Amino acid sequence: LKACLPARLISRRQGDTTGGSYPYISDIYRVAHIHFQIWKRLLWLHGQQPPDIMFWTYPLPILVKNTINIVTVHDLIPITHPHLTGINPRRLQRLLSQLVTQADILVTVSETVRQQIIEIFGISASRVVNLYQLAGVTATERRQLTTAPVVAPAGCFICVGRVERRKNIERLVEAHARSGTERPLVLLGPDGDDMPDLSPRAPHQQVIRVPWCSRESLLRSLVNAHALVFPSLAEGFGLPIVEAMALGVPVMTSRGGATEEIAGGSALLVDPYDVQDIADVIGRLDRMQPGTPQWEALRQGGMKRAEVFTEAAQIGRLRAFHTHLRELFPNRL
């Protein structure tokens, strides 16, 4: 490590129970990346009292010796869709190839990504676990959203997420114009790595850009929207889908991949590369009125689907996963 960073960044901290001290590096993750860049291999950490389990929430070029290393992979978009991100696909593939062989277990957030990991890296299916993730709206958030500042007009079509090519923004804007709807299209989220053309495609079209708002205002915008329109080109999960469904808001999203999986048959699906298909579904949603059978079917189906991703459901999956770990590593846990 001393070869990777100035010695002044390596300090010693007093232990809580042993009375001794231990080396402390404040930016170990940066060091790991430098180590991987130079030596093309993972950085292994050694400790006198390693934890039983090290649960990495992101794929980093670092693992801990003498412990069960679990690495979370949220998506493989830089590898499966390299034109949609600025992340170096070769470096990520090299990193994941080493993590796949040296970590004990990989976890991910959808069955779509799990199958991609198995197929691309040839890993045994038993070593990749889909835990999904906690998503939705808490009881506290439901109370707070009623008094949150309004940032989007009621009855709009809303798209939540980074405004970038991967979210299919230009096709969405074009489809919204073609649909003939008079409802505004609200794009709520920060700028991405590129700059999609957001200019209106028709005289009647209204496109509203909201680059940032509080969590409470975001949820208020969702619950007051006519529908969520989310024709993303690639996702590992699709958080806005679950949030909208939890609030009883109809959802349009992309057919195939993680978006269709997370929607679980409770959304209207489109071909994300077909502008007319997106426009037709926007028009169909535009004509739906709250309280009608079609509307209620989407609303009720979405709320039921959102229950799969509640805190209680996630706790159940984690408990089952811990049981699975004890079965896999009976002598280490």
Could you tell me what each predicted segment is?
Residues 1-333:
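Carbohydrate transferase catalytic cores enriched for Leloir-type hexosyltransferases
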